[in-house]
A protein has these predicted regions:
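Short amphipathic alpha-helical segments with coiled-coil-like heptad repeat character
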Residues: 62-63, 115
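Active-site-proximal beta-alpha core segment in soluble small-molecule metabolic enzymes
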Residues: 73-156
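Anion (oxyanion) recognition and catalysis
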Residues: 66
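N-terminal, Lys/Arg-enriched amphipathic/low-complexity engagement segments
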Residues: 36-37, 43-47, 51, 57, ...
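A generic alpha-helix structural signal
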Residues: 55-58, 62, 131, 154
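Alpha/beta catalytic barrel-like cores
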Residues: 1-42
Length: 156
């Protein structure tokens, strides 16, 4: 459902000017080394996550969904974190929900195959790309992209 090696590779990314909270003095570090520096070395505003609390919440939601027979496709667009998506998939999520073609490309780069689009693609190039992905996504079903009725549509 995703490529574990690609997801792990995120931690090896070298931090630079593209990373908002990284002071110039810390650029050049790998992301995996950056996390242990402590909050005092980071620029604000900055959002941090408590790994233990995140794990507890992810497990609670996964268990709740499983007990009720619910297939969960959490919003990946909120975090844009392949590592978090992988954790959710490992805990039983059916797939990941995204909002646009750029977000779909990120997910496909990391090998995610069960993706739900919570929007309509209107750009012809994005539609062609998505159709190509649907035909080649490893581990996907022919329904990788599904048409769902729109509440605004007169014909379903």
């Amino acid at each position: 459902m995703y490529d574990p090696a690609r997801v792990r590779s995120v931690g090896e990314e070298i931090l630079d000017f593209r990373h908002k909270a990284v002071p110039a003095a810390l650029q050049g570090l790998r992301l995996v080394d950056f996390g242990g520096l402590g909050l005092g070395r980071l620029q604000t505003p900055l959002l941090t996550l408590d790994r233990d609390a995140l794990d507890v919440n992810a497990r609670l939601l996964a268990d709740w969904c499983e007990e009720r027979g619910i297939l969960l496709a959490p919003h990946g667009k909120t975090t844009m974190s392949p590592e978090l998506w992988a954790r959710q998939m490992d805990l039983g999520a059916w797939g990941i929900t995204l909002a646009n073609a750029a977000q779909l490309r990120v997910a496909r780069h990391f090998g995610f195959t069960r993706l739900m689009l919570a929007n309509s693609l209107t750009d012809p190039q994005a539609i062609r790309w998505a159709a190509e992905q649907a035909s080649t996504a490893r581990g996907s079903s022919p329904g990788w992209i599904r048409r769902t009725p729109s509440p605004c549509s007169t014909s379903n």
